[in-house]
């Protein structure tokens, strides 16, 4: 439901991708989670991206990537510059990124028995600048270290800088309209696969460095462990996700539980949002045809009672349960031009929800 085009201009390559997937979602009466802010103009239904790549910027195999991604309610601009180094040294990538997106997981308002989340009037404008160091791969392990300066500004739905949410509670750690921090991040990933199974594990650790007294100081970690196993004609995938944060914290840094990729049957963050979380997912897929699979799934998640520790306690104010279970069935369709996923889920409040997803669908 989209279009892709590549243009070569000298040594540079321009990739243009326009995706009209949301029009298909609208035709299936799947309502968007938050109102369209521009009055429903045609551009609001377009999801697109523009990417410019130069493989040899200064004649020494330096690579420059400039990309812009537009979603229904969010936008991201990314500039990445890579210069070659010997394989035994960490590969450097200098990154400048700016994004604007609605903050739904923590400040969103659950509706329809927690099956959807609406806008809470809080949006994040995030600017980051730093460097990524990709360590040489060792066996099945890869590692990335990054250090970045981040500046997060909080905006209302009409684009004004704000210090408090709709109920008068602070939306930043500093109490002003923005937070600043220098973040040192270490990420390690493990992956191993055979014909009948696969295993994946990732661990992220973030440390806020106190360069200035008003900047955030915190330690945050997150892990994801996934195991896939073939059971006759079927394939079972199970995963466990968890994390925690200590130290300074703004509400938008909380772990949001609920939604697609977390606990299906709930809206984004509708289960809870806390300083800690634990989410378990399992899915069994069965082949129906060569390109169509059926799926049965069970998800459960909890904020481990840490919702009350988030500044302003947004989860309690919105009546989030703190834990929840979702289960259901779905279809997975694979084609040369993309993947289609439809899930029919029910949450702990017996509210039924349809999740619809399309990836890499283009002409």
Per-range role (PLM):
Residues 16-19, 30-36, 47, 180-330:
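Extended beta-strand-rich architecture
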Residues 1-202, 228, 257-264, 269-276, ...:
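Gram-negative/organellar outer-membrane beta-barrel architecture
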């Amino acid at each position: 439901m989209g279009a892709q085009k590549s243009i070569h201009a000298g040594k540079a390559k321009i990739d243009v991708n326009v995706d009209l997937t949301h029009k298909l979602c609208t035709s299936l009466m799947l309502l968007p989670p938050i109102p369209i802010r521009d009055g429903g103009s045609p551009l609001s239904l377009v999801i697109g991206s523009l990417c410019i790549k130069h493989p040899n910027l200064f004649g020494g195999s330096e690579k420059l990537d400039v990309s812009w991604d537009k979603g229904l309610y969010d936008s991201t601009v990314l500039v990445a510059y890579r210069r070659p180094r010997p394989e035994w040294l960490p590969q450097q990538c200098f990154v400048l990124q700016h994004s604007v997106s609605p903050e739904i997981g923590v400040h969103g308002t659950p509706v329809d028995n927690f099956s959807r989340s609406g806008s809470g009037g809080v949006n994040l404008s995030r600017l980051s600048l730093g460097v990524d160091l990709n360590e040489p791969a060792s066996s099945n392990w890869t590692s990335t270290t990054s250090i970045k300066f981040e500046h997060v500004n909080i905006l209302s739905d009409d684009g004004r800088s704000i210090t408090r949410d709709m109920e008068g509670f602070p939306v930043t750690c500093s109490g002003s309209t923005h937070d600043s921090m220098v973040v040192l991040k270490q990420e390690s990933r493990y992956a191993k696969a055979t014909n009948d199974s696969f295993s994946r594990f990732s661990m992220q650790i973030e440390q806020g460095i106190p360069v200035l007294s008003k900047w955030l100081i915190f330690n945050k970690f997150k892990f994801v462990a996934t195991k896939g196993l073939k059971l006759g004609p079927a394939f079972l995938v199970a995963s466990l996700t968890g994390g925690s944060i200590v130290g300074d914290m703004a509400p938008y840094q909380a772990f949001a539980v609920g939604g697609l990729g977390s606990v299906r049957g709930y809206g984004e963050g509708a289960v809870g949002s806390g300083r800690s979380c634990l989410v378990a997912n399992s899915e069994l897929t069965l082949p129906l045809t060569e390109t169509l699979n059926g799926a049965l799934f069970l998800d459960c998640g909890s904020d481990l009672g840490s919702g009350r520790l988030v500044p302003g306690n947004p989860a309690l104010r919105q009546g989030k349960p703190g834990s929840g279970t979702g289960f259901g069935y779905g279809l997975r369709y694979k084609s040369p031009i993309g993947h289609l996923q439809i899930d029919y889920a029910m949450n702990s409040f017996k509210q039924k929800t349809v999740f619809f997803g399309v990836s890499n669908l283009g002409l």
